[in-house]
């Protein structure tokens, strides 16, 4: 009787604690918090006083299935002894500059070229009242990210035994869909990405340049690579779709960078509703942590992760009959406040989850901009994971 009563109480608490009202009101933080030092790589956690409301683990995750994604459920089942999710109060802190909000209110963007392009006011969130599935994808791609992102580009492939391959590089990302960019180079472009490998030594100086247009049908992606072995630059039209880069060791595709990017023509897209889900959010403790502490077996150290109940727009992508992709089915989750992707499940041809991806969001309040602190790709077949696009207070360390 005691066991039954305890179970009933847990289920009741799930419904009482987590409802539509649990998400709360949006209170953006649009300026640096007290004692923030712009010369430091540290970001003060504005929610340091928050307490864990609930720890979800293998013993109780079934009580919260309504708020979990299929990928999260698979993580509990695959790593029952180590994977936990600490649930904190929802703090809807994401913000953008006032100029972006004003442009969004006055915008009249529209999709063109069968969804492969956007025509609208540069600097706005193109589709604040999104109705089409590709509206959410374009909002994610074109959301405000700051002007230029310059810094290190560390990545890690972690094996089940804890051993890892690590690398680093230098990266420059120019965001052309930005109200503060006044550059003739940006005419008709989404932006530009340049990367150079600095570690490991055998790949040092290998470089990549990608230029992305606002209309992939009219002006497809242009990419070049530099091979230090031959000292030659060559065009690289294959760096798109499901191209597997060597650095990811087969764990991630070209169009998975930043969640999703590039041409959309290989999929049929559909809306799958708006739901409340536990998602990685306001992960200041992770950002400020020691790199040695966060890289653990099977998945990142969940002690430093924070999950909140947020509203997400869910989009499905199913490969077209006459196309191919190693991920023939994908489910993407977009934060309703920031429009950024926070999670994705990539399925194989048997409708089994191949990869689960998390893109934990954090408000860089000095900008302000809500960006993913990293991309963590968990591969269930090999039990390895890829941690890349890492932003942290240790950005220059490998």
Go through each PLM region and give its residues:
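Bacterial N-terminal signal peptides
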Residues: 1-9
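Short, intrinsically disordered, charge-balanced linker/junction segments flanking boundaries
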Residues: 11-14, 396-398
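Solvent-exposed N-terminal domain segments of exported/luminal and surface proteins
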Residues: 15-221, 227
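Short amphipathic beta-strand/extended segments with alternating polar/hydrophobic composition
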Residues: 167-169, 207-211, 235-239, 357-359, ...
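Extended beta-strand-rich segments in extracellular/periplasmic secretory proteins, especially
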Residues: 167-199, 255-332, 342, 348
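Coil-to-beta-strand transition motifs
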Residues: 188-190, 201-204, 216-218, 230-232, ...
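Acidic, serine/threonine- and glycine-rich low-complexity intrinsically disordered segments
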Residues: 207-283
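C-terminal soluble interaction/assembly domains
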Residues: 320-397
């Amino acid at each position: 009787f005691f066991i039954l009563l305890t179970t009933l109480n847990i289920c009741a608490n799930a419904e009482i604690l987590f409802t539509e009202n649990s998400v709360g009101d949006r209170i953006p933080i649009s300026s640096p918090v007290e004692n923030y030092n712009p010369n430091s790589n540290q970001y003060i956690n504005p929610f340091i006083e928050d307490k864990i409301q609930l720890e979800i683990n293998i013993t109780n995750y079934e009580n919260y299935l309504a708020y979990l994604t299929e990928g999260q459920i698979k993580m509990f089942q695959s790593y029952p002894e180590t994977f936990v999710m600490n649930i904190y109060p929802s703090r809807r802190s994401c913000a953008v500059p006032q100029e972006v909000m004003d442009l969004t209110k006055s915008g009249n963007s529209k999709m063109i070229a069968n969804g492969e392009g956007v025509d609208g006011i540069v600097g706005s969130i193109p589709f604040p009242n999104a109705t089409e599935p590709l509206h959410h994808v374009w909002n994610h791609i074109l959301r405000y990210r700051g002007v230029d992102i310059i810094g290190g580009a560390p990545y890690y492939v972690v094996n089940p035994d804890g051993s890892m391959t690590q690398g680093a590089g230098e990266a420059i990302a120019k965001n052309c869909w930005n109200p503060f960019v006044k550059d003739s180079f940006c005419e008709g472009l989404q932006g530009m990405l340049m990367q150079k490998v600095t570690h490991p030594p055998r790949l040092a100086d290998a470089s990549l340049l990608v230029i992305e247009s606002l209309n992939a049908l009219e002006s497809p992606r242009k990419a070049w690579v530099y091979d230090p072995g031959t000292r030659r630059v060559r065009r690289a039209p294959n760096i798109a779709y499901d191209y597997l880069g060597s650095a990811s060791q087969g764990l991630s595709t070209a169009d998975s960078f930043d969640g999703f990017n590039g041409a959309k023509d290989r999929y049929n897209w559909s809306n799958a509703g708006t739901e409340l889900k536990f998602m990685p959010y306001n992960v200041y403790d992770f950002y400020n942590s020691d790199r040695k502490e966060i890289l653990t077996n099977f998945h990142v150290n969940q002690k430093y992760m924070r999950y909140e109940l947020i509203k997400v727009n869910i989009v499905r992508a199913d490969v077209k009959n006459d196309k191919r992709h190693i991920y023939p089915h994908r489910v993407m989750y977009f934060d309703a406040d920031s429009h950024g992707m926070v999670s994705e499940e990539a399925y194989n041809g048997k409708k089994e989850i191949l990869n689960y991806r998390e893109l934990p969001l954090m408000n860089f309040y000095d900008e302000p901009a809500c960006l993913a602190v990293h991309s963590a790709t968990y591969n269930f077949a090999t039990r390895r994971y890829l941690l890349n696009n890492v932003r942290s207070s240790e950005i220059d360390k490998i």
